[in-house]
Amino acid sequence: MPLGKLDLVEEEYIAESGDHTPEASRLMGNGDSVVENLNGHTNGAVAKKKNEPRVPDMQLGKCRYVRLHDNVNYVAAAIILRNQGDDTEVLLIQEAKKSCRGKWYMPAGRVEAGETIEEAVVREVKEETGYSCDVVELLSLQVQGSGWYRYAFYCNITGGDLKTEPDQESLAAEWYNIKDLKANKVQLRGRDFIRLVDEAVTYRTHGPVDSIPRVMPLNQNVAGLFLEFMIVKHSRDGLRTEVLVHKSIKDETYLLEEEQPFPTVEFGFEYFFAMVVSKCYRHLLEEGANVVFTPSHVTRIKCHPKPMESLAHGVSIRVYCEHKQSASKAIIRSPRYHWISVESPETRQRFHMAQKQFRPSLHML
């Protein structure tokens, strides 16, 4: 059946260039196809201004609202190191919760409505360890389902004293040698954070250049759940970098002017994060996951769970997706996108797409 004759009541509609594009208001049906939406224009409407967010290109459901502790939870965690080499230690807290009382874990806790994610990690470190800290960089984002997100930060101690008196937040805090953690010499609540410790060691050793903006959550309210795909292809010799963008992005100079240059999807809580990635890969490129690795890192996050009464506690995440070097450049399924070359080293670094550049890791649980 031709695309233009699909029944919008019973089917999700995949609009391509040349067809009328439905408004980005809600999902039209119960199928599993991706709905491709407006790209800056409506019939008779004026093109969007630069630096304004686009209406998302694709849609998989829609959140009526996003509110912390109602339908979404954010967790803030800290990795804090001291010493070097074989003497490197990590700061852990002894859990006070009944389910894991007495076991050791990284400082972490739920973000409360009315505070930023950065404020939350500073508060948790103070309550659980006794130390004041400076939040240096986002190390990792972990996502479970579509309503649970854990932000792990690299932090530095700025003051305070090691906690020794137990309370409801923690029983104590202590420094442990990383080698002892890996050798199972410490009774841990869980071992999932050890890879974050490794990432922190790598970050401290090969941290970002000072002139490059840190990847920290931007304090902007987001009315929904959004995912941006920065699909990057590096040549085998590392001399050429290409990225998939909207056709309105004529060349790399436009990247710096556009708020949202990459393919973007809005999704609802009924779609798990990994499922959204899989569906969008298949929709964007002929070979999908056969030619592009699973998103491995994040390069931008917008999230602001305040004020408390807001219904826009959602999140917008830009993910780094690396095209396989062994594969030919993927055929684009939608005519609204194209590949552009990014030749400027400064632009590559600004967008965190340079090959050896630090990027916070992404783990889909």
From Swiss-Prot:
Its cofactor is Mg(2+); Mn(2+). Its EC number is 3.6.1.-. Mg(2+) binds at residues 124, 128. One of its GO terms (molecular function) is 8-oxo-GDP phosphatase activity. Residues 72-201 form the Nudix hydrolase domain. A motif (Nudix box) lies at residues 109-130. CDD domains: NUDIX_8DGDPP_Nudt18. One of its GO terms (cellular component) is sarcoplasmic reticulum. This is Putative nudix hydrolase 1. It comes from Caenorhabditis elegans. The gene is ndx-1.
